[in-house]
């Protein structure tokens, strides 16, 4: 039985055909249907020109007229209807801004990247598969349409798509396709970092990131980005083996970067180069920084807490301080990584004992934090100033507030206004602020 979204797609096909145009389902939906995978969206290719599509349907959006794409809206669903086209002249190893409309489905399929993405279905459900996409999928192979060198030279992004599809669908890259990919990897320098990031994000969020990372490493393609990435230092020895078990993108990226051994500043720099959002950069940075704080804290005066109770106390202290500095979310990220690979910390400078203590107590420690941000303190900067006669505002205020937060969070000082102010007075006097 067809779902509503699929029925809608066939309605669009039929309507186009009744007007004398050719129309087919194409691309990802055909591939995913053959594989009995859920279809995300139905794309349609037609001999009708964009203006004709606009005229024919009641609700349309002129999504990309210069590329021949009109979005047709039926009920709650959107269908991208694209005029048969070929991509005449590729410029600078990227897909061209201009396309040429054509009359033949076959030529339209020919410009597509991989055989499994170059199949079509007509309105009766007949498969049109001129390049043997179905057989390739059955043999577990990912293969370029036609000459792989030409395909990758036309559009270098296809090399990253190749690695993504191979990992996502568990396919081996066919030999000539792989050879061409390795030979042309240096063409990746023509691709904007943003597009590289989008492909990498999908690989990392995907079903088998380790496979994708393995292919990235063995092709050497990460060394060929337009702007250099520290991520390119990845090698087979430090693969984040349990990455597919992590649910969140932040945790996956943190785990990946930490596995390579990058410090927080290097991670931040790579993520900036890759044009990640400021918020995601901050979150991953904080998780990494919290991890390194824990590691450095443990390395300091190591001999003082070889005994379990002392080690536990020390860890609790560092964990809570880390939560104040970098936020609870940072530790949850580290905690989740540890939970999927308990021995992970061992190869990153933290003993197995410490790791297992963190794993058994870490959540409790976070819950036990009565306060974790200045906002929750029962005293603010203004009140502090009001109680400190003759003192003018200055950096000392922040210093005092941070001290109060730390003492309260660690359970050494109740979060009560008068006690907080008394402690503040002591602190100012003692430190000569
Ligand atoms: P998914 O959406 O799951 O990534 P998809 O196959 O639908 O898979 P899209 O990027 O949505 O991928 O593209 C739709 C179709 O357009 C592809 O199946 C392919 O036929 C064609 N296509 C997309 N990008 C390229 C490209 N860079 N070079 C050649 N053909 C492409
Ligand atoms: Mg798609």
What are the residue ranges of the model-derived segments?
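Catalytic cores of the polymerase beta-like nucleotidyltransferase superfamily
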Residues: 1-433
């Amino acid at each position: 039985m067809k779902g509503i979204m699929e029925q809608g797609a066939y309605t669009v096909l039929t309507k186009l055909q009744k007007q004398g145009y050719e129309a087919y389902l194409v691309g990802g939906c055909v591939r995913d249907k053959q594989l009995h995978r859920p279809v995300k969206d139905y794309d349609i290719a037609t001999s009708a020109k964009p203006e004709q599509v606009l005229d024919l349907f009641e609700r349309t959006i002129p999504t990309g007229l210069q590329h021949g794409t009109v979005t047709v809206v039926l009920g709650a669903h959107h269908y991208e209807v694209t005029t048969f086209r070929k991509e005449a002249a590729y410029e600078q190893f990227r897909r061209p801004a201009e396309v040429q409309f054509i009359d033949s489905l076959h030529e339209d399929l020919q410009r597509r990247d991989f055989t499994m993405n170059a199949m079509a279905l007509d309105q009766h459900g007949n498969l049109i598969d001129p390049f043997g996409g179905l057989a390739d999928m059955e043999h577990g192979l990912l293969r370029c349409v036609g000459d792989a060198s030409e395909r990758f030279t036309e559009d270098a992004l296809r090399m990253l798509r190749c690695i993504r599809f191979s990992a996502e669908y568990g396919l081996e890259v066919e030999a000539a396709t792989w050879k061409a990919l390795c030979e042309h990897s240096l063409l990746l320098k023509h691709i904007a970092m943003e597009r590289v990031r989008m492909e990498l994000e999908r690989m990392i969020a995907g079903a088998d990131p380790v496979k994708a990372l393995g292919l990235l490493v063995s092709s050497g393609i990460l060394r060929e980005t337009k702007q250099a990435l520290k991520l390119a230092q990845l090698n087979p020895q430090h693969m984040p083996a349990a990455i597919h078990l992590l649910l969140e993108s932040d945790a996956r990226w943190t785990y990946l970067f930490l596995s390579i051994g990058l410090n927080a500043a290097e991670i931040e720099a790579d993520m900036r180069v890759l044009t990640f959002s400021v918020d995601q950069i901050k979150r991953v940075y904080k998780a990494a920084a919290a991890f390194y704080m824990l590691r450095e804290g443990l390395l300091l005066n190591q001999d003082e807490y070889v005994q379990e109770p002392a080690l536990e106390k020390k860890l609790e202290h560092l964990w809570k301080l880390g939560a104040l500095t970098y936020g609870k979310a940072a530790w949850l990220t580290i905690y989740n990584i540890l939970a999927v690979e308990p021995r992970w910390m061992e190869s990153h400078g933290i003993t197995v004992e410490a790791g297992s203590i963190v794993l058994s107590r870490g959540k409790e420690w976070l819950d036990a934090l009565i306060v974790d941000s200045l906002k929750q303190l029962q005293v603010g900067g203004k009140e502090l100033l009001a109680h400190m006669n003759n003192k003018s505002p200055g950096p000392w205020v922040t210093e005092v507030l941070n001290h109060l937060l730390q003492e309260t969070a660690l359970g050494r000082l109740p979060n009560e206004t008068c006690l907080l102010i008394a402690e503040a007075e002591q602190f100012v006097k003692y430190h000569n602020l």
